[in-house]
Amino acid sequence: MKVLHFVILLCVLVFPLRAFAATPDLPALLFVEAAASEAAYSGELSELLRARLTAAGWEIVGAETVGHRGTVGRFFHMVRRDADGAELHLIAFPGTERGSDVWTDLRMKRAAFGGHAPAEFLAVRDTPKEERGGMPLVHRGFLDYCQAALFTDAAEGETAGERLAADLRAHPSEKLYLTGHSLGGAAAILAAARLSDLGVSPDQLIVTTFGAPAVGNEDFVRTYQDRFTLRRVVMRGDPVKDVLPSPLGFHHFGERIDWQPARTTAAFPHTMTVYVDAALRRLYDTHDSSGALTFLVGQENRTAGHTVYLTPIVVEVDDALAEDVPYLRAVLRDAQYVRNAATVFAPADTSGPLDVTAQARAARTVGAEQMLVYRISGEKLRDAHETYRLTLERSVYDRDGNLLAAGARSAVTGALTPMEVILYLFAQD
């Protein structure tokens, strides 16, 4: 498949290559798609996701198009190439974050959906109300968002959506993953339906949404439910999934996957950062959280540098954060591996105080040039609901145990979860 224009060389945190294998690891795939959906936004975690891992090999193609009545459609086309030349493709649609997005959400009239070319899409959309009996009907704002993003601007006679469809038809063994949060998830569903109308096989279209509303009526569901794979991830306490069915007569379809936010998460359950945190926890629960590389196994890390030795990570937190301790250690180890693949990890011995002399001896044994010591501390803030101040301390020693540098950074959870705060603090170092 061809890469679209105006490539932005960004990168995404620890995306597992084998998440897109012929038989994908579902927890890894869901983490990839959650991270991609968050990376499509702006904000601290989104910037962190976009800033991490050129070595992971992802190129992100960003597009933004103004469509009908000022609707702004946006998407990111993420492409990664394997060593054998095979390409992995993912389309992520941002959710609501701009004034134009709010206008899109509020345009809740129903519009007809169908056609087999962009011009037909518009003609069907404008079908008079009295002639729409038995037709698939969808949310007008979501429809215009999808139309603007993929089926408005034509380059060399084809819109972005038409090029995607042509490439997929020409390569029937390839798959396209579409994802998004809230409004972005609604756009992903409609985009898959449009690509299906352009002749793309159901086996090639895989959609995952996070906290997305229903997009169409019973006729839409009946027409498209077997024409692509749809997984709907729903967070407990997220009200958006129930916003549209009653007033517009819309229906959900596809496989529903229920998640629950971590107890230490203070953010509103609809927030995409809550979904990212839950996806990462499930990934660690599936794989060995005591080892690094949990979602980089088998990948070449282009950030390998001089050999360093990472001592057991010391974590001293309030009892309220006790359940998070293994996740905090695991995500910090993975972040260090992403920074330097030549890192040698000490056995995860957390009993007793850290013996710097003994650890320096172990560092020399493995030929490390330097030794890293990390300490995570955290305490709950008074009179604040599940809000914590986390501190990440880092000390660097030479191979003989002499201190070379030390520093500490701290941040408060809230918009970010405890795991995400540790990643954020690590990135500031």
Where would I find each of the regions flagged by the language model?
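Lipolytic serine-hydrolase domain surface
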Residues: 217-302
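Boundary of Sec targeting at the N-terminus
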Residues: 20-22
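Serine-dependent carboxylesterase/thioesterase catalytic core
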Residues: 162-248
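Amphipathic beta-strand/beta-sheet edge segments enriched in Tyr/Trp
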Residues: 373-419, 423-425
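Bacterial N-terminal signal peptides
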Residues: 6-18
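A conserved cap/lid and substrate-binding interface adjacent to the catalytic center
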Residues: 59-179, 197-204, 227
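A short, hydrophobic beta-strand-centered structural micro-motif
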Residues: 308-312, 355-382
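A structural "domain/chain start" motif
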Residues: 296-342
